[in-house]
Amino acid sequence: VPENTVNPPPAIATRIEREQAGVGTARERDDDRDDFSHGFDWPVHGRISGQYGSQRIYNGTPKSWHSGMDVAAPKGTPVHAPAGGIVIFANPDLYLTGGTVLIDHGQGVSSNFLHMSRIDVKVGDRVEQGQVIGLVGATGRATGPHMHWGMNWLTVRVDPQLLVTPASEQPAIEAK
């Protein structure tokens, strides 16, 4: 990956901090909806290329642990909402995460999708389970096209694979 995404210069580090603060603010939303209680589906099918909790190493430099899972898929593959919810963040150009979308599933449960090549939703949109929210990409600090799926319960990271059936047992995704 480009060196300035591994060890960003001070001006870029300030931008990254500002962007991360915006994402953190979006995650503070906590309401009584229970979209999460209807279960989660895989947003994309493909080879799992990055595991939750693994040590990330870029250009030989150890970085933070991986707070989501990566699914390799061709650029332009549709990304589907894994559960219903409200879009609480959508930005096509964050420095490290590229095209980024966060969906609030209620009671502090949220999903995030990173490195998207296109975003088809905006903040405030209500999305249904299975709805296309954008397309797989390789934007931000990415080694190739994939969909990063992270889950949070407020500030606590959660492994998305705990919430879905094993990938090998998933039926084909149908666009809604």
What function would you assign to each model-found segment?
Residues V1-Y52:
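Non-catalytic extracellular/periplasmic "stalk"
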Residues D41-K176:
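Catalytic cores of peptidoglycan-degrading enzymes
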